[in-house]
Design a protein with these regions (language model features):
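Alpha-helical scaffold domains
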Residues: 1-232
Length: 232
């Protein structure tokens, strides 16, 4: 690890002071077992991020530290306009758990100018966390990128169908999450996501059947239909 700046060291000391062994044990119960963690609650990490503000160089130092909470902090203080494609690739290879992956996609990666490109590329990867990142990023884009065109999300559907037979738990849940979020954007995408889910349901795979049934339960529900109709 390279030598950290005084500002980064102060932030890490503050994080460590807010950590607890009990929180680390709680993380483990959810399958979050990073190599190095302080056990800092998420609200405390977010509060520190607000105090620090956007800082690309500082974000890179936090990632370099290897500390789980510092890496979460990096995603919150990083400037998405300064984030490069190669840095995103490095980050996705360093993810240690679904929590690190999902929080980074939801708080940072979807804002990157090449987010759609990365989502499609990562969805074809082999390693479980990297592939999950592709689908987590799709879900984040579907929820947060209000200006994105339908065609960008339609390109996700074949990738979701292709991954539906991946029986790994983190992939199965991420594919389901993504198809549900895409299908809740508007009426057109709802229809296309429902069609995709019906195709997935016919695949000879327990994972595919679960993904389809759970997604259709929500996407065809009266509540979702009414909400989409109200949007027009």
């Amino acid at each position: 690890m390279t030598r950290l700046s005084p500002r980064a060291r102060r932030a890490l000391r503050e994080l460590r002071a807010k950590g607890s062994k009990r929180s680390i044990e709680g993380m483990a119960r959810y399958g979050i077992r990073p190599k190095l963690a302080y056990g800092v609650p998420a609200p405390a990490v977010r509060a520190l991020a607000r105090k620090l503000g956007r800082d690309h160089a500082l974000a890179l130092e936090f990632r370099e530290s290897g500390v789980f909470e510092a890496r979460a902090l990096a995603a919150l203080v990083e400037d998405p306009k300064a984030l490069t494609s190669s840095e995103m690739e490095r980050w996705v290879r360093e993810f240690e758990s679904w929590a690190d992956c999902d929080s980074t996609c939801l708080s940072l990666f979807w804002k990157a100018p090449f987010a759609f490109e990365k989502a499609r590329a990562w969805a074809k990867r082999g390693p479980e966390i990297q592939r999950r990142a592709g689908f987590a990023l799709m879900a984040a884009l579907a929820v947060h990128d209000k200006g994105a065109q339908d065609r960008q999300f339609l390109r996700f559907l074949p990738l979701l169908e292709a991954a539906a037979t991946d029986e790994r738990n983190l992939i199965k849940k991420a594919v389901n999450w993504s198809i549900r979020q895409v299908g809740k954007r508007n009426g057109r995408l709802n229809r296309e996501a429902v069609h995709a889910a019906h195709r997935i349901a016919k695949l000879p795979s327990p994972s595919a059947r679960w993904i389809a049934s759970d997604a259709l339960r929500e996407l065809e529900s009266p509540q979702v239909k009414a909400r989409l109709k109200k949007r027009g």
